[in-house]
Amino acid sequence: QTYTFWEHMYKLSAHKTHEEANFLMETRWVLYMEDADTLHLFRVAPRAWFADGERIDLEGVRSYFGRIDARVRSHVGEGYIEATVTCDPERKPSLLAVRLPHPQGKKPVRVTGGRYDETTEWVLIDDFNGEASIRLEY
C-alpha cells in the first residue's frame, strides 16, 4: 500500500481514490471535527504545532456548522497561548471544544474564555454564541 498522490491525472492508477480521500479527511479531523452538536478544534494536533511562535490559521473552512474561522497564536516563551474562533451564528454548535496543549505538557494557571478540562486539555465553551476568545496563561 502506498499513501501518496499522483502529480498528474492518468486514466489508470495503482492508487485507490478512497484512500486518497481518507487521507484528506484524516487531515481535516486533526484540525476540526464535528460530533453531534459539538465542534472539536485541534483534537489530535501535535504538541509541536503549539511551540513558541507557531500559529494555526483556519479561514473559511466548511463544516456541518457552516463556515469556521479559527486562529491560534503560541507565545509560550512569554507564558501564554491565544485562540479565536468564529462561525455562523445561525448554525453554531451547542458546545465548542478547543484543545490547546502546551508543547511541554504544562497545565495553565489561568484560563479565560471557557472552562478548562485538565485531563483532556480541552477548553470547553457551553452555549457557544458563534464567537470565542481563549487565553491560556502558564
Question: Model regions: which residues?
Answer:
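Non-catalytic C-terminal accessory modules of carbohydrate-active enzymes
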Residues: Q1-Y138
